[in-house]
Design a protein with these regions (language model features):
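Extracellular/periplasmic carbohydrate-active domains that bind, remodel
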Residues: 1-231
Length: 231
């Protein structure tokens, strides 16, 4: 069954925070045992959204889902243990995430639409290299990850365009059976830390037919401190 975010109260003006409306659609789909959450054509600003079991977030052609850069709109990273582990507050773990899921199964992001991280509002060229415009740009704003999916089994991302991430684009941690297919990641090629695809302590990951343009790692298999302790 399909659940339109418009019917849940989303407004396609690119200004209104539609997080509550989108989350209502996700929750309704999950409560019914699964379904597709439809983002139609239009520009939808949103704070963090948490996907759930058996839910597909589907962006139709012409849809643009925009990440808020307001810290109040963004979910912080889940912390491990009692918070005393120094890895929990290490650099790179302070920005929160826009789209994610935790300890879920059968989660999909699909469609011909775009997820826009507003990285072009974060990275500033101050001409530090005297006109060559090749050095990494300055970062002067709050920078959430575009996506963080932790301990998700059967996770698929296909066909979408991920544009101008402000930090890591697609971070998967402790996930199993991951398929990334036919996506485009179009980030600033001078943006700091705007990695493309980061499988972190994951198993059975297949990345195919993707175009990835970033200012940092395009695809990097890694084992970060916090996640290696968990997985």
């Amino acid at each position: 069954m399909d659940y339109s975010i418009l019917r849940c109260g989303a407004v396609a003006d690119g200004v209104t925070n539609c997080a509550a409306a989108i989350q209502r659609a996700v929750d309704a789909a999950a409560a019914a045992g699964g379904g597709r959450v439809i983002v139609p054509a239009g520009r939808f600003l949103s704070g963090s959204v948490l996907l759930k079991d058996n839910v597909e977030l589907h962006l139709e052609s012409g849809a643009v889902l925009i990440s808020s850069l307001n810290p109040a709109d963004i979910t912080p990273f889940p912390q491990g243990g009692d918070g005393t582990d120094p890895d929990d507050t290490a650099d790179g773990w302070e920005g929160g995430f826009f789209l994610g899921a935790s300890h879920a199964k059968n989660v999909t992001i699909s469609g011909m639409g775009t997820i826009y991280g507003q990285g072009d509002k974060v990275f500033l060229d101050k001409n530090v290299d005297n006109g060559f415009h090749e050095c990494p740009k300055f970062c002067e704003a709050f920078r959430p990850r575009m996506m963080l999916f932790e301990a998700v089994e059967n996770f698929t991302v296909r066909d979408v365009t991920l544009q101008d991430a402000a930090f890591w684009t697609l971070h998967m941690a402790g996930c199993r059976h991951v398929r990334i297919q036919n996506i485009m990641i179009l980030n600033d090629d001078r943006g700091a830390n705007n990695d493309g695809i980061d499988p972190d302590c994951c198993q059975d990951v297949v990345i195919s037919n993707c175009i990835v343009r970033t200012g940092d790692d395009a695809i990097v298999v890694k084992s970060t401190g916090p996640m290696s302790r968990r997985y």
